[in-house]
């Protein structure tokens, strides 16, 4: 780090065991304080750290760790910094030891899904450990957790290595960072697959305890200054008779309230039921990195969804997400769609197929749907929402219709030629959408077009759709003759049927900052 080199040797007169720390050790200390939120990098000037800022950061860390408070680097402080811990920051900037709150879910009945397991534990032991991790919280707060084995889940748990392409905060190998999690309503929990994950022994890293800690984050709890609390940032080791610390209990109850004793027995019987995967036999599984899509939509939760055949996947900056059966996310929705469009104006998603339309709010079908949609030609090619006039555009062949969801629209003047409004766009597009960057995109075959503010095709387009899907060098290894993703046997992936396809599975967070991937060499298991 260049900004450290100018002052590192002069600013930090730190010693350990009577000897002065070298530049590399000092840099590691500063990196730690910066990484976990004890020290803030100056906004202006690369060498503007003040000695008092670093001293205060060390004092805060020592206080939060239950160490003698000196503001100096000593043996105990150095040892504490080397302990395995959670990857989230410690926003300790107040004197109170009270729990920290990061937000909460707007519902209390949550689903979770286990995507893979480490090589050191069997599937039954992993499942038992994770179920117990959730149960610690549901035993003291009015929360229920239900495991699902396919489709969307509120909380998604997975194991990643150093080179995971779909996890923005990559892990560092054995020791140091053990796991990290998203805040509420994002829902990703990632574990370092290189740790020696164990259960029922003092050796290795106890999966049950670490998972319970990360679930606490996923429910909205920050780190606790009580070193004996589950939500303390540093791993305290295996505890065979573990119970939540009073600070953990107070924090979760501040978010969700107390669990009612009279409903406890009833909920205990139902909270860990599992939901079986969809059993209907789907069509062939597509490769997201080849071929055209049936529809594309910037949908609920700000995620980009691509549809092909009976499957849907999310598109992230790190590549295509997992393939789900469409009906697993939107119950009652068929595959092989003609078009789809999400309207931020009404928060409704409309899907078109033949002469019918399906309407969903989030992932729930509206009453009375599907219904016939005879006001335009059947078998549409594409649809998009245009934020400029808050209208929905429907495309078929070389023409388009402009439809107002909330008002009676006179469609007798349509269709109008696509080229009169969207210059340079091909006829019969397979998909279209307005995206987060405010631009309009059209897709056809293996190409896509971006339009500028004048609704003309931008320079450099069309481009290959693999660029849009962020495939490129991130594309999983494929069989050169079939294009199928090549499986193997390093990790265990859950919730899919045995197949030679789809060995890359990803559930991105709502921010697309933490999504999950499994490298090549995976064994796919039926749920």
From Swiss-Prot:
Cellular localization per UniProt: Cell membrane; Secreted, Extracellular space, Extracellular matrix
Signal sequence residues: 1-18
Cofactor names: Zn(2+); Ca(2+)
Cystine pairings recorded for this chain: 289-471
Record: active site: 214
Chain segments carrying region Disordered: 473-500
GO biological process: angiogenesis; cell differentiation; collagen catabolic process; luteolysis; ovarian follicle development; ovulation from ovarian follicle; proteolysis; response to cAMP
Pfam families in alphabetical order: Hemopexin, Peptidase_M10, PG_binding_1
Chief location: membrane
UniProtKB keywords: Angiogenesis, Calcium, Cell membrane, Collagen degradation, Developmental protein, Differentiation, Disulfide bond, Extracellular matrix, Glycoprotein, GPI-anchor, Hydrolase, Lipoprotein, Membrane, Metal-binding, Metalloprotease, Phosphoprotein, Protease, Repeat, Secreted, Signal, Zinc, Zymogen
Organs and tissues of expression: Highly expressed in the liver. Expressed in the arterial tunica media of large blood vessels.
EC annotation from Swiss-Prot or TrEMBL: 3.4.24.-
Residues bound to Zn(2+): 86, 213, 217, 223
Annotated glycosylation sites: 109, 464, 479, 521
Residues of the propeptide: 19-98, 513-527
PANTHER family: MATRIX METALLOPROTEINASE, MATRIX METALLOPROTEINASE-19
Record family assignment: Belongs to the peptidase M10A family.
Protein known as: Matrix metalloproteinase-19
UniProt organism field: Mus musculus
Taxonomic path: Eukaryota, Metazoa, Chordata, Craniata, Vertebrata
Encoding gene (name): Mmp19
């Amino acid at each position: 780090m260049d900004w450290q080199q100018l002052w590192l040797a002069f600013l930090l007169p730190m010693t350990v065991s009577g000897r002065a720390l070298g530049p590399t050790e000092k840099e590691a200390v500063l990196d730690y304080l910066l990484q976990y939120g004890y020290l803030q990098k100056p906004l202006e000037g690369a060498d503007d750290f003040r000695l008092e800022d670093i001293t205060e950061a060390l004092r805060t860390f020592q206080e939060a760790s239950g160490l003698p408070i000196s503001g100096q680097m000593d043996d105990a402080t150095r040892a504490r910094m080397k302990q395995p811990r959670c990857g989230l920051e410690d926003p300790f900037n107040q004197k109170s030891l009270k729990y920290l709150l990061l937000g909460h879910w707007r519902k209390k009945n949550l689903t979770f899904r286990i995507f893979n397991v480490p090589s050191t534990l069997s599937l039954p032991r992993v499942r038992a450990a994770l179920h117990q991790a959730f149960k610690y919280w549901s035993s003291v707060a009015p929360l229920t957790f239900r495991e699902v084995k396919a489709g969307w889940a509120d909380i998604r748990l997975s194991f990643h290595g150093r080179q995971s392409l779909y996890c923005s905060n990559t892990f560092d190998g054995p020791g140091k960072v053990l796991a990290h999690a998203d805040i509420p309503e994002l829902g990703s929990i990632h574990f370092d697959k290189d740790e020696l994950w164990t259960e029922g022994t003092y050796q290795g890293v106890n999966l049950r305890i670490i998972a319970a800690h990360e679930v606490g984050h996923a429910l909205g709890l920050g780190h606790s200054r009580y070193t004996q609390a589950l939500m303390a940032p540093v791993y305290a080791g295996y505890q065979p008779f573990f119970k939540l610390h009073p600070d953990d209990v107070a924090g979760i109850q501040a978010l969700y309230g107390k669990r009612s004793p009279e409903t406890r027995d009833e909920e205990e019987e139902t909270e860990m039921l599992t939901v079986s995967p969809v059993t209907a036999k789907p069509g062939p599984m597509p490769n997201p990195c080849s071929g055209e899509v049936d529809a594309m939509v910037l949908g609920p939760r700000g995620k980009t969804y691509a549809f092909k055949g009976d499957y849907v996947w999310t598109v992230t900056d790190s590549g295509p997400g997992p393939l789900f059966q469409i009906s697993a996310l939107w119950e009652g929705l068929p595959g092989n769609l003609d078009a789809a469009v999400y309207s931020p104006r009404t928060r409704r998603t409309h899907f078109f197929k033949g002469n019918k339309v399906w309407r969903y709010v989030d992932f729930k079908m509206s009453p009375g749907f599907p219904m016939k949609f005879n006001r335009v030609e059947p078998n549409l090619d594409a649809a998009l929402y245009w934020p400029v006039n808050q209208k929905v555009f429907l495309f078929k062949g070389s023409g388009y219709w402009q439809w107002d969801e909330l008002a009676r629209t006179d469609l007798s003047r349509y269709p109008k030629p696509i080229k009169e409004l969207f210059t340079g766009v091909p006829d019969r597009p397979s998909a279209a959408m307005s995206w987060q960057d405010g631009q309009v995109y059209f897709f056809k075959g293996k190409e896509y077009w971006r339009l500028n503010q004048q609704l003309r095709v931008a320079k450099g387009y069309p481009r290959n759709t693999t660029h849009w899907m962020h495939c490129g060098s991130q594309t999983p290894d494929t069989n050169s003759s079939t294009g199928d993703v090549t499986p193997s046997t390093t990790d265990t992936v859950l919730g899919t049927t045995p197949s030679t396809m789809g060995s890359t599975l990803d559930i991105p967070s709502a921010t697309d900052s933490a999504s999950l991937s499994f490298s090549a060499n995976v064994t796919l298991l039926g749920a």
